[in-house]
Amino acid sequence: MIEFYGKKLNTYRANLHTHSTTSDGKYTPDEVMKLYSDEGYDVMCITDHRKTNRIADIDPHGMLLISGVELHPAGGRISRSHLLCVNVPEDFVTEEMAAQPVPGENHMQEIVDAVNAAGGLCFFAHPYWCGFRSEEVAALHGLAGIEVYNTSTRYIGRAYNMQLWDELCDMGLRFPALAVDDVHRAHDLFGGWSVICCEERTPECVLAALRAGSFYSTQGPQFKRLSFENGIFEAEFTPVTTAICVSNQCRGYCAAAPNKDGDGKTPEVTSLRFDVRNLFAASKAVINCDYLRCQLRDAQGRYAWSNPIFIPEEYRG
C-alpha cells in the first residue's frame, strides 16, 4: 500500500521487459513466469524480439500476464532502435515489423503509431545502450516513456538513463520511466522493477496506471508516500543513505549527506520535505517547463525513482 499523491493505492511489483525461448532467452515462457512468481512479482509482460506469445498457453503462476513484444525498426545513428510494446494483440507483428532494419531508413514513428492504435503503450528501451540522444527520442510522438534502468545492460556500463530522462523532462515531455530486467539469462534476474500503484490488479487498472505514470521504479528502496500540495513536495520511504529532489534547475535538495564525522556510521533518512519555490529563489533563467522527481539511494547502492511532477506556474518564484 502507498499514499500516492492523496490516494491510498495498492502496489504491484512488475517486470515489463522479459525474454524467453520464443526469441533469445534461456528460459521457456512458463519457466520465466515461475521464476518471477517465486520472487514475489505481481505483473509480467513477455516482450520477445519480433514475436508475441500466445498468453492463453502460458501458466501465469498467479500473476497478471500482459502480451507484449520488442521491436527494432530502423532509425538509429549507431544501432537500430529497441521499442518496448506493452499490451499489443498476439497478431500485432507484421512481416514488415519483423524484418531486419534497412540502414538509412527510419520506421520508428510508424511502430509507435501502430502500438498506440492497437491500444498498447510504447516505451523506448535502454536508449543509452542503443546510443540515442535525448533529441532523437524526443522526436518520436506518442511514446509512453523510457527505461531509466535496464539490468541486462549493466555489464557494459550503460544500464542507467537518468541524464537522458532529465533532458527529456527539461524539454517539457511528461515521460515516466520504467526499471526493468530485460531478462535473457540468470544474471539478469530481479535487478530492477516498477511498482505499479492502482486500486486493483486488473489489466484495465494496471494499464491505466502505466499511462498515467502512477508507478515508481526501483532496484530495492520503496516509496511509502508521495505528496505535492501547496508547493510542498513530501516523500516517505524505506531507509536510504541519500534522498534527492532532482529538477532542471541548478538548485535541488538532498535529505542526506555523507557522514562528515568520519565515525564509520552510515546515516540514513526515511523522509524529505521540500518547498519547490526554493528551486527558483536564485534563478533568473527562463525555462520552458519545470519539473521535480525524487531519487533515492540505499547503503547497497540501489536506486529508486519517482516519476516527475511538473510544477505549476504559481510556485515558480
List each language-model region with its residue ranges:
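C-terminal functional module detector
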Residues: M1-K7, T11, M171-P176, D181-G317
